[in-house]
Amino acid sequence: MRTHTLGFPRIGGNRELKKAVEDYWKGAATRQQLEDAARAIRLRNWTLQREAGIDVVPVGDFALYDHILDAALLLGVIPPRFRNDDAPRDIDLMFRMARGQGGDRPVAPLEMTKWFDTNYHYLVPELDAATTFAPDAAPLLALIDEALAAGFTPKAVLPGPMTFLWLSKRVDGGTRWSLLPALLDAYGALLRDVAARCPLIQLDEPILSLDLADDIRSRFVPAYARLRVAVPDATLLLASYFAPVGDNLPVALSLPVDVVHLDLVRGPEDLTPALDILTRAAARQPADSGLPQSGSQSGIALSLGVINGRNVWRVDADKAAAPVRAAVAALGPDRVWVAPSCSLLHCPVDLDAETGLDPEVAQWLAFARQKCAEVRLVADMCDLNGRADAPETAAALARNRAALAARAASPVIHDPAVAVRAGTVTPEMGWRATPYTARIAAQRAALRLPVLPATTIGSFPQTVDIRAQRRKLRTGQITEAQYDAAMREAIATAIREQEALGLDVLVHGEPERNDMVEYFGEQLRGFCITANGWVQSYGTRCVKPPLLYGDVARPGPMTVRWITHAQSLTQKPVKGMLTGPVTIACWSFVRDDVPRPVVFRQLALAIRDEVADLEAAGIGVIQIDEPALREGLPLRRAAHAAYLDAAVGAFRLASSGVRDATQIHTHMCYCDFHDIIDHVAALDADVISLEASRSRMELLDVFATHAYPNEVGPGVYDIHSPRVPSIDEMETLLRAASRVLPLDRLWANPDCGLKTRDWPETRASLAHLVAAATRVREGG
């Protein structure tokens, strides 16, 4: 029985990668210094895994920006605007594709979107009829050599060809699948080079956890047959995760691979049919038949993902061991591997760094390093060669059971008052008093905005001084009063800047918020905050999800004093800025002892109370951000309705207790709305803003097809790139939007908040946005 991981956090225990990459971008570090920092992180990652008991470490899971971008470069998928005959395929090209910066002029970066149903974002490879794959395994081979030289047993990790193509975009409108034969040739060449140094290769095919059309599913077997011909002697591990493989299981287990990984956290129901398929295959092919076992059903091993790779709660080792024992009984220990459910990319690195957590809560947790030890514990519990009875196994199991028992009995988890409040909710509380078509007149009379009003999404640059003030407060160098004064001045600066730019609806800029979810987690009961529990969101952007461990309640107002201060400084409307209940849940590490709809409702009631306080304080525009609503959608359609009903109900419960004249906004990120547009409309937000610039407004088509009735603010510039788009570029996007939706139902805004940008580029971009909106408004 072997232990392995599908991937490990790449940011470093103290976000060393973020600092190294950003220093390189600023010219404060050389390429050699960046490469040295990356090498040190990889070595530390491999060492932590081996010390925790992992037999085989992943190589290729590490990326300076994004692993799908790395795969595109390995395959030579480089769009023409990034090509330069004299430029090598190196990290500068990679960063240019990610950010649009570098070279002789700024260009539009690759589109970015969510990685399945997680809060990680990947860069979308671009394909067209002229795409020619040019594989070059050298970067991956260098990493393999690095691991071998350090004495590790490596497993090369690559996205599988079917998933790579699925995640890519045909920019010329053609079908992606016409490029599959050429892509398989490129993969075959890559795998041949890799297998010569590292015969164990993991190919990630998470699209096997989706509802696949028959014509897509049918391509898997011939595709993998070609790969097997390319590397007949390699050990191929096919990995799927994030949902049950379900009806794709017969295909997955018929592929000519040696190991198939199943996510038994998200898809425990996959185990029984998988064992049935494999044991029946073995019965049909006797061991002495003389036929090759490798790559046939009768010889396939199962990698069982029994440790949750997406949450931070300590595993129930007894529960996790049960499917492993069942697999060992059916297949034998040599055909069973133990692993986390998915890459540990989605977890913080090391719980040992959290010295300030409440010890009671800390004992319930496991971060990436601890999850590796949990993999080892579960494997040892199921070992047939003596480890199950070893004293160290017994001691680790005793600690695990004690922690779980303590959590179950803890009085800090349950708040009777929260249950009483939830019991008072009525269906009428989830509906506005009148439909949008009736209340829009009251809002326009109250707000007196021009056609195509210009606004921003919420946050403004978090300057060095703002971050320093927060750090000084945390370390006791300044008082609360001094901190409040500094934040009020930052808010005043944001208001002055917006008025000078000519924006129509202003925001306070959120200087007091370190993160749009963590800020609320700090003020709501039922949460605790880590000091170093960072996870990667995209590139160098890291987030620190709060830990939602118990019933949620709001002790008092959370945002009112900041928003009312901002409103006192201007005659223009200032938006109240809140994070919605679904996003708070999706972007937190959420308790696993109650159903998700229970958490949604508790959070919705807390936000509802905050909305009421903002309205009572005279705030006429209130934005409740739900960027994670689409992200939280289960991958399988069978689970969609229950999730969407709970999510929409939570948003409406949070937002519907206001007068007609109060305008409710929401914001969503990187979404494909086609399959949920009815539910987006059911939110009944007066205005929805969304990220649309990288897709060149393609996202709006669904709003026209659906005849979406309310107002829309399509993002007209990408805030994830430092590039300042021109007035003409934004005008073109706004005019494209006006061909889809009437001008009197459109807003002009950036794609997202401006927290990560600097003031010079923010001023320039917003000035261009206002100018573009004015042109379109005046030109009709």
Swiss-Prot record:
Record flagged with keyword Isomerase: no
PANTHER family, per database record: 5-METHYLTETRAHYDROPTEROYLTRIGLUTAMATE--HOMOCYSTEINE METHYLTRANSFERASE (PTHR30519)
GO biological process: methionine biosynthetic process; methylation
Record text on cofactor binding: Binds 1 zinc ion per subunit.
Lineage: Bacteria, Pseudomonadati, Thermodesulfobacteriota, Desulfovibrionia, Desulfovibrionales
Pathway the protein contributes to: Amino-acid biosynthesis; L-methionine biosynthesis via de novo pathway; L-methionine from L-homocysteine (MetE route): step 1/1
Record: residues binding 5-methyltetrahydropteroyltri-L-glutamate: R15, E16, L17, K18, K114, R541, C542, W587, E631
CDD domains tied to this protein: CIMS_C_terminal_like, CIMS_N_terminal_like
HAMAP family linked: Meth_synth
Entries under InterPro entries matching the protein: Cbl-indep_Met_Synth_N (IPR013215), Cobalamin-indep_Met_synthase (IPR006276), Met_Synth_C/arc (IPR002629), UROD/MetE-like_sf (IPR038071)
One Pfam family, short name: Meth_synt_1
N-terminal signal peptide: none
Cofactor: Zn(2+)
Keywords assigned by UniProt, alphabetized: Amino-acid biosynthesis, Metal-binding, Methionine biosynthesis, Methyltransferase, Repeat, Transferase, Zinc
Binding-site residues for L-methionine, renumbered to this chain: I457, G458, S459, E510, D625
UniProt family annotation: Belongs to the vitamin-B12 independent methionine synthase family.
Top-level division of the source organism's lineage: Bacteria
Record function comment: Catalyzes the transfer of a methyl group from 5-methyltetrahydrofolate to homocysteine resulting in methionine formation.
Native species: Nitratidesulfovibrio vulgaris (strain DSM 19637 / Miyazaki F)
Annotated positions binding Zn(2+): H667, C669, E691, C752
Binding site for L-homocysteine: I457, G458, S459, E510, D625
Keyword Methyltransferase attached: yes
Catalytic activity: 5-methyltetrahydropteroyltri-L-glutamate + L-homocysteine = tetrahydropteroyltri-L-glutamate + L-methionine
Catalytic residues identified in the record: H720 (proton donor)
This protein's name: 5-methyltetrahydropteroyltriglutamate--homocysteine methyltransferase
